[in-house]
Amino acid sequence: RALSFRKAKEVFDRLFAAGRRDFAVIGSDTVVAFQKEGETKPVIIGKPKDAEDAVRILSMLSGKTHRVFTGVSVIANIPDENAAAQCSIRKKEEIKTECSIRGKAEIQTECSIQEKAEIQTECSITEVTFETLSPDEITDYVNSGDPLDKAGSYGIQGPFGMFVREIRGNYFTVIGMPIPVLYKMLKKIGILPHGFYERIE
């Protein structure tokens, strides 16, 4: 969750400093945790350093079960209409803003009016079990280039999906964005996406 929050906060700060209001930023980050036999602490796996590292990771996970953790953070700027009205009286270049993100952040402007920044952070966990992969299957997949930018060195939504024996938990967590979790977070903030049920011709 900390990594997803830092990603969201970086973008939020940049947009707020540029004068944007009434917006939301979504950040996510995924890591894989694998418990080796005889080890007390799990190995935390991010993206592979290179093809050789991807081969090492997939060989380690082959035929085994690991856990996928995806942290999601939403930071939403909720402007105060009265604040906007008072601030608009002054020239834009005279209005400087300062953003300080805390648990429930308060964004203080020079107009002495506060705007709220709603923050939600969640972590979704899914267990994934691989089939036993042969060295050739691992090499062929790594040579495709697909695993080189993915946590755990695989993309379940692509060709590698054929090597997944079982999933226990949210499929979207493994992809890197647990949609059901995100939807609940947006509802808590008061952001309700529209058009989900519109028929596509």
Name each region found by the language model:
Residues R1-E201:
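Anionic-ligand binding patches
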